[in-house]
């Protein structure tokens, strides 16, 4: 019996578990979830540093106001200060350079005049002026980035500053895709009478990559039960997830569900009260491998991926698998179907009163071009036959 979209999503999340960890280089860690807490092994910065280009001095030398000091050297970023500051002396310093011993203030260049041998400070400065103390940004031992955090550019920079070149992140799910149908032909090959191009394979493969999965295999099988068992069985080896398209309904040539049963996979649900995508099926193996059997119609396959596979991949990657809808206003009527949640492909605009949506062209499940330019899905509840123009509607953004 078909289940509601809410119950289907909840069932998926009950079975989608966070995967184990792996260490990756920082350049490969963008968008990954940190697997363990990152504590600072040392202070950042590790030494007192200059915040300005200028001169390192002793603040006491300016207690009486303007002062002329003898230049005794230079401190550059990236090198230890090779000279100390004593009363009556100063050291030229660059931004980020270590503050020389004896200095306790930095005077910006624009507050001075210099003839190369001496520097005159315009007025009194206080201790600590433009000095970045050790640990100003991060203290040694501090918890800086917590486990489960999605690593963005700022997080990568912070980890680098803490000398963590290979953070431990949640492993990417290994995903296989299997298309079904005698009629499918690869792009670039001659098209026989009655055949069609396999658009689902490339579309779902791209969707897997975009959602953070690792596509390890993309296979196809004709409309034969024993062949389907063999191909799916091989595709299920050493993966975390299998996604099939087509062959999931109740016709005489639909063999995916019987094949999965023969392979020992238990159906969690078979059918969702959803338009398009009603035949969508979800099964789980004894080892926890997830199988999403999506319809063959291109739009239905992509809808099923967005609504059910993406939350599963998010959860497996250590992200939140919850997808919270946003309120919007329908600028045109949105047709629903009582008894099923109807998902309308839309384009959005942000206006003064919030988000507005308009449906794309034909909402038929075989019109793949209706997905072009779509940035949101509008959800017409299963107890409504439509949403009128000007009425509120829940939407989920897609990216």
Regions from the language model: what does each represent?
Residues 2-6, 20-23, 27-28, 32, ...:
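Electropositive phosphate-/nucleotide-binding environments in soluble metabolic enzymes
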Residues 22-27, 36, 78, 119, ...:
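Flexible glycine/proline-rich
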Residues 1-66, 117, 133, 319-343:
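Short, low-complexity N-terminal leaders and the immediately following helix N-cap/first helix
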Residues 146, 254, 351-354:
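Proline-centered turn/helix-capping motifs that create local helix->coil transitions or kinks
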Residues 1-5, 165-294, 298-303:
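Helix-rich terminal scaffold detector
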Residues 50, 86, 107, 237, ...:
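Structured loop/turn residues at beta-strand edges in well-structured enzyme cores
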Residues 9, 13, 53, 109-110, ...:
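Predominant activation on well-ordered alpha-helical scaffold segments within soluble catalytic domains
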Residues 5, 11, 38-41, 55-222, ...:
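Short, glycine/charged-enriched hinge/interface segments at domain edges or termini
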């Amino acid at each position: 019996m078909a289940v509601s979209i809410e119950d289907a999503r909840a069932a998926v999340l009950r079975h989608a578990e966070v995967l184990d960890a792996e260490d990756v280089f920082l350049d490969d860690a963008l968008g990954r979830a940190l697997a363990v807490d990152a504590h600072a092994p040392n202070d950042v910065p590790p030494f007192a540093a200059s915040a300005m280009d200028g001169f390192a001095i002793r603040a006491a030398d300016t207690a009486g106001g303007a002062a002329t000091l003898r230049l005794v050297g230079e401190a550059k970023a990236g090198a230890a200060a090779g000279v100390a500051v004593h009363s009556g002396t100063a050291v030229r310093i660059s931004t980020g350079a270590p503050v020389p011993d004896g200095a306790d203030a930095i005077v910006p260049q624009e507050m001075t005049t210099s003839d190369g041998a001496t520097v005159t400070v315009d007025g009194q400065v206080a201790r600590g002026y433009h000095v970045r103390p050790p640990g100003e940004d991060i203290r040694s031992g501090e918890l800086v980035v917590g486990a489960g955090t999605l690593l963005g550019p700022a997080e990568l920079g912070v980890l680098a500053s803490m000398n963590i070149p290979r953070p431990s992140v949640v492993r990417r799910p290994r995903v296989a895709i299997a298309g079904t149908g005698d009629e499918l032909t690869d792009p670039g090959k001659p098209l026989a009478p009655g055949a069609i191009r396999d658009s689902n394979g490339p579309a779902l493969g791209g969707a897997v990559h975009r959602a953070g999965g690792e596509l390890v295999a993309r296979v196809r099988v004709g409309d034969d039960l024993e062949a389907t068992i063999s191909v799916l069985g091989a595709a299920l080896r050493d993966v975390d997830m299998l996604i099939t398209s087509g062959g999931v309904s109740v016709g005489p040539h639909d063999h995916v569900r019987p094949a999965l049963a023969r392979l020992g996979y238990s159906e969690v649900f078979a059918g969702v009260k959803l338009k398009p995508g009603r035949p969508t099926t979800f099964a789980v193996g004894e080892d926890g491998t997830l199988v999403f059997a999506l319809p063959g119609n291109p739009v239905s396959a992509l809808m099923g991926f967005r609504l059910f596979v993406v939350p599963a991949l998010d959860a497996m990657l250590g992200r939140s698998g919850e997808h919270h809808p946003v309120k919007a206003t329908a600028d045109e009527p949105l047709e629903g179907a009582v008894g099923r949640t109807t998902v309308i492909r839309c384009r959005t605009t942000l206006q003064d009163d919030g988000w507005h949506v308009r449906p794309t062209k034909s909402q038929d499940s075989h019109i793949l071009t209706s997905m072009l330019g779509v940035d949101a899905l509008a959800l017409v509840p299963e107890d409504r036959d439509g949403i009128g123009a000007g009425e509120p509607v829940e939407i989920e953004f897609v990216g």
